[in-house]
Amino acid sequence: MPISDWPKADRPREKLIAHGSSKLSETELLAIFFRTGTRGRSAVDLARDTINHFGGLRPLLDASFEEFRQIPGLGEAKFTQLQAATELAKRYLQEKMQRSHNLTSPELTREYLSAHLRHYPYEVFAALFLDNQHRVIAYEELFRGTIDSASVHPREVVRRVLKHNAAAIIFAHNHPSGVAEPSLSDKEITETLRKALRLVDVRVLDHMIVGDGEVVSLAERGWI
């Protein structure tokens, strides 16, 4: 049955207007985004089938175009729209963390770093550069590949810190395996960087490990 034939209170758009987006399911939100379904399938049916196919919203948003187009009714237009919406969400989080905002929320920091790092199929080492009031100056992805003491260069990190005139820094990198548990190498890298940055009077506030649905803070573990 077309959504237009549903009771008005059950239609996703009308529900959103009446009750707000937080009251809708992921299927209903995706249906609004898709706008239309396919022959014999409403946009809600298409949204439900898509989420079930990928096993959740996160793998759907991380899917490649080739994976996305395997679903009947999904093609280039919907893929590019979804990628644009995902990027807008990342930039929204970045705007919330701009220089005018003090970095006082660990959850916002986790959310921001997860949005930027969790989708990479390889390891990426990044940093949030902060001023002396812990306001965000910049976010940079510094190193890619296997993250160990041979690939993370303290001299380059110090150079970037001095460029931004940062007073403090938060490191982060992802574990493509999805398991966010810090390794011995992660701890060693953190300590090496702490020693290097201490020479230029810059504090390392944290090193966060981004997994699949989880972000582990070394500071909260008492390792910084």
UniProtKB/Swiss-Prot annotation:
It comes from the Bacteria. A motif (JAMM motif) lies at residues 173-186. Disulfide bonds: none annotated. PROSITE patterns: MPN (PS50249), UPF0758 (PS01302). SUPFAM superfamilies: JAB1/MPN domain, RuvA domain 2-like. Transmembrane segments: none annotated. Keywords: Hydrolase, Metal-binding, Metalloprotease, Protease, Zinc. One of its GO terms (molecular function) is metal ion binding. GO terms for biological process: proteolysis. The keyword Hydrolase applies. Zn(2+) binds at residues 173, 175, 186. Belongs to the UPF0758 family. This is UPF0758 protein HCH_01020. It comes from Hahella chejuensis (strain KCTC 2396).
